């Protein structure tokens, strides 16, 4: 299934991806010697593509053959994890990792844009990349920790966590709300993660455990909201990207 959130013409999609990944950002709080994962939004590329692209631009010269992508479910409610059964973009089909240890028996889901929107960027990094696309339903803190431990049993993997930030708030209120969310994410604040206004709070719970177990620290790359992009500040959606 092709995605309505980005261009469906291969040449046009490549052009947009090249533009979105053109700028390699400087990390505000120091250099990252080794990149283990990123946190990125999943809105339409015209809204959040540059924020996502800056995170992926840091991976341009990295050798990445395998990635786990985790994003929230927008279309059905469930507990735990599901896996996308197939992924195809205008740039080609993606090989789904079927033998990723600890995740072999998950139920399959046909589509989820929070994952699918990341795939063209990954294909620009490595057209032959293999992906484990995990849709995250509701999870407890204990289960989030167990999922993180299982993920870490598989070596040489890039982790991608997908979330947008606040939804449909006036501009100033959104900025204030998102600043708090940014602090919670960067401080790996388990106690407050359920409070945040972000659709990917459950994937972020897993991210926090992953980072705590490995002593990784998320560092903000860029924050904007849709009001910065469209000029309409009456009701906006927040977007941020991080690297760890």
What are the functions of these language-model segments?
Residues 1-230:
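Active-site histidine-anchored catalytic micro-motif
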Residues 224-244:
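Long, Lys/Arg- and hydrophobic-enriched amphipathic alpha-helices
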């Amino acid at each position: 299934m092709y995605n309505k959130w980005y261009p469906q013409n291969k040449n046009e999609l490549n052009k947009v991806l090249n533009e979105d990944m053109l700028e390699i950002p400087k990390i505000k709080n120091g250099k990252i010697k080794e990149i283990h994962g990123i946190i990125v939004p999943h809105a339409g590329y015209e809204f959040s593509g540059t924020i996502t692209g800056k995170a992926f631009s840091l991976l341009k010269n990295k050798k990445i053959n395998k990635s786990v992508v985790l994003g929230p479910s927008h279309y059905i409610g469930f507990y735990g994890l599901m896996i996308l059964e197939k992924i195809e973009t205008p740039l080609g089909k993606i090989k789904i990792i079927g033998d990723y240890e600890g995740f072999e028996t998950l139920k399959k889901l046909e589509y989820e844009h929070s994952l699918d929107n990341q795939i063209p960027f990954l294909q620009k990094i490595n057209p032959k990349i293999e992906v484990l696309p995990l849709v995250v339903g509701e999870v407890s803190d204990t289960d989030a920790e167990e999922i993180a431990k299982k993920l870490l049993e598989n070596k040489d993997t890039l982790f991608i966590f997908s979330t947008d930030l606040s939804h449909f708030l006036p501009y100033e209120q959104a900025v204030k709300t998102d600043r708090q969310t940014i602090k919670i994410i960067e401080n790996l604040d388990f106690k407050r993660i359920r409070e945040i206004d972000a659709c990917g709070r459950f994937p972020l719970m897993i991210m926090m455990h992953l980072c705590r177990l490995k002593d990784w620290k998320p560092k903000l790359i860029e924050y904007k909201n849709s009001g910065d992009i469209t000029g309409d500040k009456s009701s906006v959606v927040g977007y941020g990207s991080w690297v760890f």
